[in-house]
Amino acid sequence: MSIYTNSKPWTVPALAEAKRNGSKIVMLTAYDAGFARILDANGVDLVLVGDSLGMVVQGHDSTLPVSVHDMVYHTACVARGVRQAMLVVDLPFQADASPERALEAATALLRVGAQMIKIEGAGHKLEVISYLVEREIPVCSHLGLTPQSVLRLGGYKVQGRGEEAGGRLRAEARAAVEAGATLLLLECVPSQLAAQITTDVSVPTIGIGAGAGCDGQVLVLHDLLGLDSGHPRPKFVKDFLAHGGSVAGAVRAYANAVRDGSFPDVEHTYTS
């Protein structure tokens, strides 16, 4: 199979065009330049420097210990390996506690190569989203299971089950878009609900454990490669390196599966 090539770098307008055209968007995490180059050359549209690095790189039990300094360091590394993909970066725990604090952290990340900032949650985070967007910073709103809220949630659990919870999540998604979010990431949400949200909103949705009805998919690279992170393997994960081959081949297989709709399958999704 030939190496994927994209003639144009991904931009915010390109995301909107993909939504209009029904083109699936492929996203993966990376934490260093070497893997970023592989993703960039093999069909990945958006590269996410996630605070998941706290668990899969640093070995913590959650993402809470990750600092802005950590995110700046890894973003700078990944940015050196990306040419075509858009670089999306998490604001770590409490870096978005206030609009001013979020702007300071986001600015530091943009200066080393970030092109979009991802923020977890709704509520007061809507003010943060608006504040950043008003200052020309594209924002991805992460809803559903938000790992930075693991202590409040009591663990990593499916969100939005039941009519009341589902309605609340749909309202949060609409509010995030109204606040200016360019992209929504839906994590561990029943597939039917994620599909409804995807229809509700004008911006693309990226799912992880949210079914095939989203506009795109994301996985943690270590999960896609079957690497042991020391944590239970989520239901939504598929090991694309299980039958051998190369890292590049596994990334291509994932990208192709997202685009042709074969991933995620029913076994990787949750129901209401």
From Swiss-Prot:
The active site lies at 187
Cofactor field: Mg(2+)
Q: How is the cofactor bound?
A: Binds 1 Mg(2+) ion per subunit.
PANTHER family to which the protein is assigned, alphabetical: 3-METHYL-2-OXOBUTANOATE HYDROXYMETHYLTRANSFERASE
Annotated source species: Xylella fastidiosa (strain M12)
Q: Which pathway does the record list?
A: Cofactor biosynthesis; (R)-pantothenate biosynthesis; (R)-pantoate from 3-methyl-2-oxobutanoate: step 1/2
Q: Kindly state which keywords UniProt assigns to this record, in alphabetical order.
A: Cytoplasm, Magnesium, Metal-binding, Pantothenate biosynthesis, Transferase
Q: What is its main location?
A: cytoplasm
E.C. numbers: 2.1.2.11
| Xref: CDD domains | KPHMT-like (cd06557)
Q: EC top class, in one word?
A: transferase
- Record's Gene Ontology CC terms? cytoplasm
As for family, the record states: Belongs to the PanB family.
Catalyses:
3-methyl-2-oxobutanoate + (6R)-5,10-methylene-5,6,7,8-tetrahydrofolate + H2O = 2-dehydropantoate + (6S)-5,6,7,8-tetrahydrofolate
Q: Which residues bind Mg(2+)?
A: 51, 90, 120
Kindly provide the name given to this protein in its UniProt entry: 3-methyl-2-oxobutanoate hydroxymethyltransferase
Chain sites annotated for binding 3-methyl-2-oxobutanoate = 51-52, 90, 118
Role: Catalyzes the reversible reaction in which hydroxymethyl group from 5,10-methylenetetrahydrofolate is transferred onto alpha-ketoisovalerate to form ketopantoate.
Assembly information from the UniProt record? Homodecamer; pentamer of dimers.
Q: Which GO terms of type biological process are on file?
A: pantothenate biosynthetic process
Query: What GO molecular functions are on record for this protein?
Result: 3-methyl-2-oxobutanoate hydroxymethyltransferase activity; magnesium ion binding
Query: What domain of life is recorded for the organism?
Result: Bacteria
Q: Show the Gene3D superfamilies listed in the entry.
A: Phosphoenolpyruvate-binding domains (3.20.20.60)
Magnesium in keyword set: yes
Q: Where in the cell is it found?
A: Cytoplasm
